[in-house]
From Swiss-Prot:
Main location: cytoplasm
Keyword rRNA processing: yes
GO molecular function, one term: rRNA (guanine-N7-)-methyltransferase activity
Primary role: Specifically methylates the N7 position of guanine in position 527 of 16S rRNA.
Domain of life: Bacteria
Binding site for S-adenosyl-L-methionine: 89, 94, 140-141, 159
The enzyme's E.C. designation: 2.1.1.170
UniProt keyword annotation of S-adenosyl-L-methionine present: yes
UniProt enzyme class: transferase
Name of the protein this chain belongs to: Ribosomal RNA small subunit methyltransferase G
Pfam families referenced in this protein's UniProt entry, alphabetically: GidB
Amino acid sequence: MTARRAPAVNRDVLEQMLIDGTAALDIVLTDAQRNQLLDYVALLGKWNAVYNLTAIRDPRQMLIQHILDSLSIVPHLRGRTDARVLDVGSGGGLPGIVLAIVQPGWQVTLNDIVQKKSAFQTQMRAELKLTNLSVVTGRVESLQPGGEVPEKFDMIVSRAFADLSDFVKLARHLVAPGGSIWAMKGVHPDDEIARLPEGSRVKQTIRLAVPMLDAERHLIEVAVDEAN
């Protein structure tokens, strides 16, 4: 059985969707950043069959459910210009590649345990010319500052990676003083929050509005005690 082909969509259509979506999110992109994001969508579609990156094949839905979904967290994270960011369970590079494109002053590290996904991420770093992006393969709980990663991170983010309590347990040792863990979720994860480990607490819960997407989205910020 042959794989179902993605529908052809004119780049101008995607560009207008991106312009409208970023305007709704109050995000201003340069022409270069907009083209990088559109190139990323095209590359996701091109290499999806090889790397098994996403079940979504329609470029319009990729733009909405991957790019705009990832962009929706930017207004809540962009308080500083030089942040060190770790994207855990990054898969096809979401949200980390999007963050690296729109926040060029950030140093973004993508992490996944699957070598094939890391290979795609490395390819995207080269093709999109993202000098502020790095890739590390392995389990997040095994990463050590000064070893697999150079130092701890100001922000550790994930998108559909794991149960919130598990995410915090696995990644808390990589949070820099004053830093936070940020989890992108669908419906509000009350049960997951109730299971948060000792020494961690929800700092804020943000209901996200993703343009053109009729679905619940939440961003949960978790602070962890430095002693843990």
